[in-house]
Amino acid sequence: MIDPIDGTRSFVIGNPTWSNLISLNFKGNPVVGLANFPILNKYYLNFDNKNSFVFEQGKKRKIFVSKNVPFSKIKVSGAFHGAVSLKQQMKIPKVLKLMQFPTADALSYSHFCEGKIDVVFQTTNKIWDIHPLMPIIKAAGGVVTTWDNRDAVNAGNILVSANQLIHNKMLKLLKPVSK
């Protein structure tokens, strides 16, 4: 599966956060993932379901999500992309308070895999948006589901967290706006 330009709006305005996303799927499940950021001259890769790597400035580095961060100190990147009304957002004030970083499409998920961000949530992901990232996220140690705690393979509103404890707390906080 190929998403030739993930972050189309970023691409159009010249923001360097757009990417090329590629996944190899087997029986509908992503097994290999690549997130390439041409302008940033870096890419993220998982090809064995065991290890995820970032390649930058000619160097390969194994990446991991942050694991032992207390919930009170998590770094959250999120976006509603117009899919959750302002009225609905008012039902989740704790989530809004946690949001510290706007999402940058696939780059937010990639930074999550490096442990720079502890939680990423986005609405309206398509399968070509999330399939290439799922193997990278999982092999880096992350948890990835929909907001209603279903397998992310069918896309939709996606939540990724550094560990199951954080994930469960975020699912509970997002529940009022989960479909």
Predicted regions and their residues:
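Buried hydrophobic positions in well-ordered alpha/beta secondary-structure cores of metabolic enzymes
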Residues: 7-8, 76, 112
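Acidic beta-strand-loop-alpha-helix segment within the catalytic core
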Residues: 21-109, 158-179
